Amino acid sequence: MLKSFEKHLNAVSRKCCNFILGSSIPVLGFYCADTCIRNAFMEFMETRNSKSKYVEAFNTVQSNGATSAISTFHILKDEIIRRIPLLPIIQELRETRMSEVSAEEKILLWNQLKFMSLVRMFTTLAVLAQCNLLCKLALTVLGREAFKEQMVKEFDPSNTLRPSGSDEDPAVFTGIAYILLNNQLDELIQQVQLAVTLTFEEVSPTDIVDRKLIEALTTRVVEVFVNNYQFSIDGNKEVLLAEIPKQYIVTGNLLYRVLELEDFATQMDASIVMKNELIALNEHMLTYLPSIPQEGIRLAKILTTFTKISENVFEAPFQEQFFQSLQMVSDVNRYMAIVFSSFDDC
């Protein structure tokens, strides 16, 4: 009975179309499917109570995803600081005040500090965007399955899609998201370094720049990074799952969800969402720049401000403000809505 129902369910799911998330009221259109199963689903989705449950489930998943993203970033920020340290360069600069160091050496150290500050700042923005995207994707995939099971129970309370004691725990899945992000960090930093180098190699710290040029330069960094960086799940997935705490029994269910997460996280749509997130974060970051006079200002002074921003972004109030700017990116919710409505087990 259960297998037969799942067969019909997948037939209907593959023909799911015309998903609309407007005014927080999602509508699922099903067509060309088995009449009995189709009618059962339509009857379920047409009731006001069911729509309310759908919206509530979706909104809960997104809220939990945002919270998980902040927690994940809080852990990853220590890795960013460790892998892109600014303190040694700052200490060297302090020591030059007490020693006879040539002006050329001091300029070299200042330029190195400014370059590393840019790299750390844009790495931080990229990790913020990825945490928001991947954590929300992870919980949306799990939330969709939970809602799907709820629909099945509405259709036939005696059936269930998943065995009791499933290992699809949100804490485990967000832990996997952290492992994936941490494993990708070195590659991400390399691509940020490339983007910063290509963008700023033609300008000198002594150049006079205005706000429009600064905006163009930072936007260019985002574009170069997005064009060269591609999120992926490398290595043996069994090794990845082996890092899960032993109190959880890893089953095929969780492995399948990891494959789903990989599929959604590596699609072109996800890259577009990532780019729009970075654009929003970059725009928010620019609000911290000092007032620039009409005649312009030395780039070196702006880069000094970037150094301060790269330090402040790790503080709680600044983190919250950056994450709030991500919640304004409508493409994130649109993509999560598509994922949440993809009732397809194939």
Curated annotation (Swiss-Prot):
One MF annotation (Gene Ontology) recorded for this entry: protein-macromolecule adaptor activity
Cellular component GO terms held in the UniProt record: cytosol; nucleus; peroxisomal membrane
GO biological process, one term: protein import into peroxisome membrane
InterPro entries in the cross-refs: Peroxin-3 (IPR006966)
Protein name: Uncharacterized protein C29A4.14c
Organism the protein comes from: Schizosaccharomyces pombe (strain 972 / ATCC 24843) (Fission yeast)
